[in-house]
């Protein structure tokens, strides 16, 4: 599933082509995605100018005066800006045509993505109750320490809780915990403020660097220009169970934590 760096890469690729453009029309070929596409998308978007392309957590928002189209890529979704006469491929479910003859095309083979509508002045229910963005100043060791008190869940599960911080999925949680030297199994409520500061710093560094590398290509993700992400080539622990730890050379451990595959070094991460 695309995580924050992949979604931010998509946003940065789309924004120059969409911001300031007016929507000419919307074609819905399949509305039965993870959630049915509401009629407001086709009813409200045409004629509206796209004022901004934003990201909140793993959602993309196309802001207009009437409201925002809220997009989630799901497991396999992709968004590309194409010439208006580009032939259809399998799983091309939605076209948003623009006033310059180009279009934004949403392709989603597995149909776990979504395209929803947020009226102006409202916050969509899916965007309510979310934690801070991990790259914002509000996300630091003090914040993690305060939120973790009394929490007995493993720190990896805690870090992936969208109510705690948004956009840190399985890949980047594993890499951040490794860089911070914290075992994913350690109880969240038993980690010191100092160690949480190291973890917050690691999350910011790894996510920021992954964005510059175009995200991580695992199976399905490609950026809007069709290029893969390159951060996968630099993963230190994720997907490397049984291989030598890049720090100490011992075999990396594997376990299921919170129903997610987890890999770590039991020597370097405590």
From Swiss-Prot:
Listed SMART domains: Fapy_DNA_glyco, H2TH
Cofactor note: Binds 1 zinc ion per subunit.
The organism of origin for this protein: Stenotrophomonas maltophilia (strain R551-3)
Segments crossing the lipid bilayer: none
Gene coding for it: mutM
Summary of subunit composition and partner proteins: Monomer.
Binding site for DNA: 91, 110, 151
Annotated SUPFAM superfamilies: Glucocorticoid receptor-like (DNA-binding domain) (SSF57716), N-terminal domain of MutM-like DNA repair proteins (SSF81624), S13-like H2TH domain (SSF46946)
Recorded catalytic activity of this chain's protein: Hydrolysis of DNA containing ring-opened 7-methylguanine residues, releasing 2,6-diamino-4-hydroxy-5-(N-methyl)formamidopyrimidine; 2'-deoxyribonucleotide-(2'-deoxyribose 5'-phosphate)-2'-deoxyribonucleotide-DNA = a 3'-end 2'-deoxyribonucleotide-(2,3-dehydro-2,3-deoxyribose 5'-phosphate)-DNA + a 5'-end 5'-phospho-2'-deoxyribonucleoside-DNA + H(+)
Obligatory cofactor(s): Zn(2+)
Record's keyword annotation contains ATP-binding: no
The protein's Enzyme Commission number: 3.2.2.23, 4.2.99.18
Protein name: Formamidopyrimidine-DNA glycosylase
Organism ancestry: Bacteria, Pseudomonadati, Pseudomonadota, Gammaproteobacteria, Lysobacterales
């Amino acid at each position: 599933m695309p995580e924050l760096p992949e979604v931010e890469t998509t946003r940065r690729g789309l924004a120059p082509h969409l911001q300031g453009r007016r929507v000419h029309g919307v074609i819905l070929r399949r509305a039965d995605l993870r959630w049915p596409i509401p009629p407001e998308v086709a009813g409200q978007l045409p004629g509206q100018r796209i004022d901004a392309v934003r990201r909140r957590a793993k959602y993309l928002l196309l802001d207009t005066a009437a409201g925002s189209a809220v997009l989630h890529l799901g497991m396999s979704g992709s968004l590309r800006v194409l010439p208006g006469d580009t032939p259809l491929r399998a799983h091309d479910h939605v076209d948003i045509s623009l006033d310059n003859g180009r279009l934004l095309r949403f392709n989603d083979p597995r149909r776990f993505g979504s395209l929803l509508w947020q009226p102006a002045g409202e916050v969509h229910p899916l965007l309510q109750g979310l934690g801070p963005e991990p790259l914002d100043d509000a996300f630091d060791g003090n914040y993690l320490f305060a939120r973790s008190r009394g929490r007995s869940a493993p720190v990896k599960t805690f870090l992936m809780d969208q109510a705690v911080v948004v956009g840190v999925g399985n890949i980047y949680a594993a890499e951040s915990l490794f860089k911070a030297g914290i075992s994913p199994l350690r109880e969240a409520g038993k980690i010191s403020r100092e160690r949480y500061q190291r973890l917050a710093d690691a999350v910011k560094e790894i996510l920021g660097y992954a964005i510059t590398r175009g995200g991580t290509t695992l199976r399905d993700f490609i950026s809007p220009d069709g290029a893969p992400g390159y951060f996968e080539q630099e993963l230190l622990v994720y997907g490397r169970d049984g291989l030598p730890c890049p720090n100490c050379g011992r075999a990396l451990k594997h376990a299921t934590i919170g129903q997610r595959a987890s890999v770590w070094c039991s020597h370097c991460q405590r």
